[in-house]
Curated annotation (Swiss-Prot):
Source organism, top-level taxon: Eukaryota
Assigned protein family: Belongs to the universal ribosomal protein uS7 family.
Quaternary structure and interacting proteins, as annotated: Component of the small ribosomal subunit. Part of the small subunit (SSU) processome, composed of more than 70 proteins and the RNA chaperone small nucleolar RNA (snoRNA) U3.
Sorted UniProt keywords: Cytoplasm, Nucleus, Ribonucleoprotein, Ribosomal protein
GO cellular component: cytosolic small ribosomal subunit; nucleolus; ribosome; small-subunit processome
Compartment list: Cytoplasm; Nucleus, Nucleolus
Name of encoding gene: rps-5
Protein name, UniProt field: Small ribosomal subunit protein uS7
GO molecular function per UniProt: mRNA binding; rRNA binding; structural constituent of ribosome
Length: 210
């Protein structure tokens, strides 16, 4: 049997290396340019690499173990926190739509990446110092304590959502508009933000209990 390997000159075309497409939130906003300015919160405000998603929905995979929520994308944590008060429980589609509309409003008003505005708002809204109760039932006093980074993020998200919810109650403005205003004011550090006012109040009480 003749060996035909030498006569056949087959050249396989090398497939061009294709780069993975950049993941953009809602197909609009890049997550690679987002920067967490507070070094203590870098590990607790996940936005890049594994946390980059097209939609803020992971089907509850971050609730299986304690503290796993620290790895949950920050935009999804915002959407989850909006599902508060019994009438809103489980309405994830509604809260994702609210977040999307709020981000579009933020982009129109500021021209900045809305995810960066959210990250700045979380950094500015998390209290660095709080007070706790020390002592038995008879003699109880309050003592100032430092706040852990994860709790700072938790409280910041809760305060931002509470502020937006209370502003939208019995108001002509939609909750998406109120959430956009709250995030913009908190990112600037403005006292018009509910979250900034509450954070300053907590830190003032803690300072008096040092």
């Amino acid at each position: 049997m003749a060996d035909n390997w030498g006569s056949e000159n087959v050249v396989a075309d090398a497939a061009p290396a294709t780069e993975a497409p950049e993941v953009a939130l809602f197909g609009k906003w890049s997550l690679q340019s987002v920067n967490v300015s507070d070094i203590s919160l870098v590990d607790y405000i996940p936005v890049k690499e594994k946390s980059a998603k097209y939609l803020p929905h992971s089907a509850g995979r971050f609730q299986v173990r304690r503290f796993r929520k620290a790895a949950c994308p920050i935009v999804e944590r915002l959407a989850n926190s909006l599902m508060m008060h019994g009438r809103n429980n489980g309405k994830k589609l509604m809260t994702v739509r609210i977040v999307k509309h709020a981000f579009e409003i933020i982009y129109l008003l500021t021209g900045e990446n809305p995810v960066q505005v959210l990250v700045n708002a979380v950094i500015n809204s998390g209290p660095r110092e709080d007070s706790t109760r020390i002592g038995r039932a008879g003699t109880v006093r309050r003592q100032a304590v430092d706040v852990a980074p994860l709790r700072r993020v938790n409280q910041a998200i809760w305060l931002l959502c509470t502020g937006a919810r209370e502003a939208a109650f019995r108001n002509v403005k939609t909750i998406a508009e109120c959430l956009a205003d709250e995030l913009i004011n908190a990112a600037k550090g403005s006292s018009n933000s509910y979250a900034i006012k509450k954070k300053d109040e907590l830190e003032r009480v803690a300072k008096s209990n040092r």
